[in-house]
From Swiss-Prot:
One term of GO molecular function: ATP binding
Pathway membership, UniProt: Cell wall biogenesis; peptidoglycan biosynthesis
Cellular location(s): Cytoplasm
PANTHER family given in the database record: D-ALANINE--D-ALANINE LIGASE, D-ALANINE--D-ALANINE LIGASE A
Domain of life, per lineage: Bacteria
KW Magnesium (keyword) present: yes
EC number: 6.3.2.4
Name this polypeptide is given: D-alanine--D-alanine ligase
């Protein structure tokens, strides 16, 4: 049987570069497992932090070391070229997190290449990345959410006379605590929990340095639960998992530092709540036009039984600590089986 050449694409220019490397390393291990080794050949392709694509031999070194490649100090303009091996790929497995990886830009390039790839297309990826657009789509789908406000960088930076009034409006509408987030970053990068006017002003300035679109959400006392989705037109939802942590909120350091957060799988919730979360996950998946895979995050207000959708991640992490593969393992699909199924789904979607 002829093996499929899987282009494992990782790295990238976002702040989640290191997460991408760790995810790619785990996927490469799963693709090399006995049940997959006879089906797939891995062709790793690494994108350096400056956006330069690196050939498989260099990419393999990065996978083995799990360390980013240093970028040249020479900043003179260069014309990046794809490694020639790119033309040998049968199916792409992109595992780039954040901007320029899961926001539709890379998906557009792969679509132009006319080669199958794992995950959502341009639309689903773009909607899933931009928190403001995502929330608009969720509202249209009738999915309940926390109260929020949207802002622009121009509102925060352009007129110092308007800024105090903007903060007044946030305080009156959302109160404290609230969360300030850049609209287009993942892994909690740039997010701040604020409890006072001074913290709010600082957080808004910080978020504006990351993105020109900012969202501010009301804080809610709730359990944080997540559900994984797998499939294309008839997707399935996994068991529900819960994240517990000792830090102030589920920030970048807590997410990716061993021992800082605990994943409880399955979550200890009533069966009716489990079913409702699964149904809402599938509704969110359809609403953004996702494909292949996604992880959907919720707030479960135990006191009232209310379930509020937080966000959908169309290219969730695949590190040793990541919720997505662990949810499917608890549902009965091992890591090697999961990556195999994702490749099958990519091929199916491409043939439609």
């Amino acid at each position: 049987m002829t093996k499929l050449r899987v282009g494992l694409l990782f790295g990238g220019r976002s702040g989640e570069h290191e997460v991408s490397i760790n995810s790619a390393k785990a996927i490469a291990t799963a693709l090399s497992a006995s049940e997959n080794a006879t089906k797939y050949d891995i062709l790793p392709v690494y994108i350096r932090k400056d956006g330069c694509w690196q050939a498989p031999d260099v990419a393999q070194q990065v996978l083995e070391s799990a360390q980013p490649l240093s970028t040249p100090t020479d900043k003179s303009p260069q014309l990046w070229q794809f490694p020639p091996q790119v033309n040998q790929v049968d199916v792409w497995f992109p595992i780039l997190h954040g901007p320029n990886g899961e926001d539709g830009t890379l998906q557009g390039l792969l679509t132009l290449m006319q080669v199958p790839y794992v995950g959502s297309g341009v639309l689903g990826s773009a909607v899933g990345m931009d928190k403001i657009t995502m929330k608009t789509v969720f509202a249209k789908a009738g999915l309940p959410q926390v109260k929020y406000m949207t802002l622009s960088r121009g509102q925060i930076w352009s007129n110092p006379c308007i800024f105090p009034k903007l903060c007044d409006e946030i305080e009156e509408t959302l109160n404290y605590p609230c969360f300030v987030k850049p609209a287009n970053l993942g892994s909690s990068v740039g997010i701040a929990k604020v409890r006072s006017r001074s913290e709010l002003e600082k957080a808004l300035d910080q978020a504006a340095s990351y993105d020109r679109r900012i969202i501010v959400e009301a804080g809610v006392i709730a359990r944080e639960v997540e559900c994984a989705v797998l499939g294309n037109d008839n997707p399935k939802a996994s068991v529900v998992g819960e994240i517990t942590f000792n830090s102030d909120f589920y920030d970048y350091e807590t997410k990716y530092t061993d021992g800082r957060a605990q994943l409880l799988i399955p979550a200890s919730v009533p069966d009716s709540i489990m079913t409702q979360i699964q149904e809402m996950s599938l509704a969110a998946f359809a609403a953004v036009d996702a494909a292949g895979l996604a992880r959907v995050d919720f707030f479960y207000v135990e006191k009232t039984g209310e379930i509020l959708i937080n966000e959908i991640n169309t290219l969730p992490g695949f590190t040793a600590f990541s919720m997505y593969p662990q949810l499917w393992a608890a549902t009965g699909i091992s890591f090697p089986q999961l990556v195999d199924r994702l490749i099958e789904l990519a091929l199916e979607r491409h043939q439609r």
